[in-house]
Amino acid sequence: MDRKELTIVEHLVEFRKRLLAVVICFFLVFCVSLLFADQIYQYVTQFFQQKLIVLGPNDILWIYIRLASLMAFTITLPYTVYHIWSFIKPGLKKEEARAIFAYIPASFLCFLVGLAFGFYFVTPAILQVLLGLGEGLFETQLTAQNYLSFVFQTTLPLALIFELPVIIAFLTSIGLIGPELLIAYRRYAYFILLVLAVILTPADFVSDLAMTAPLILLYELSIAISKHIMKRKQKGARNGNLT
């Protein structure tokens, strides 16, 4: 039977199967990650030289669960995207399917680049500045929960925000926006990005500044990408008219 002729019940059955496959994959990766949670913990805390403290035995378990969940989410993400794509692809036109598929690898790559940038550059820089403010005045003792929350708050938002160029490129390719619109609303976009940085990061000026700078650069990169795509579309249209 053709996919377009499937009933609602059959669609729901297929959706259930794909969702179950993703959940099982997540659970398996989670269990494996839990076995290596101590190594993951050492890797995540490599930028902090002191021993982190815990306030109770339950904290250790929750820390391991959070780390395993993060690993499972990151590793399972491509598999999840594959099932989403397989589910919606038959309902799309060939041009729409081609346009969306072209951005899937770029989207995942930008997510990983955002994670790496946040973890290796933004988090250590913010941590060094903030700890330096209290040097000689305070004895710094961070709990593992506090530290991991700090790392997640400065890393995961950047991973999501690094999707901005991909989103802008996709919207430009389907004609919803163009570089002129992005340039015209640049000042408002900067303000929104600043507010977004304040919301997503810990409540201090250094974190806000460290988050805002890459956001602005990403927005400018998005404008450049949008210009390139628009020029390519216009060139293709001119060539089509000539033929």
List where the protein language model places each region.
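Membrane topogenic/interface segments and analogous intrinsically disordered interaction regions
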Residues: 1-243
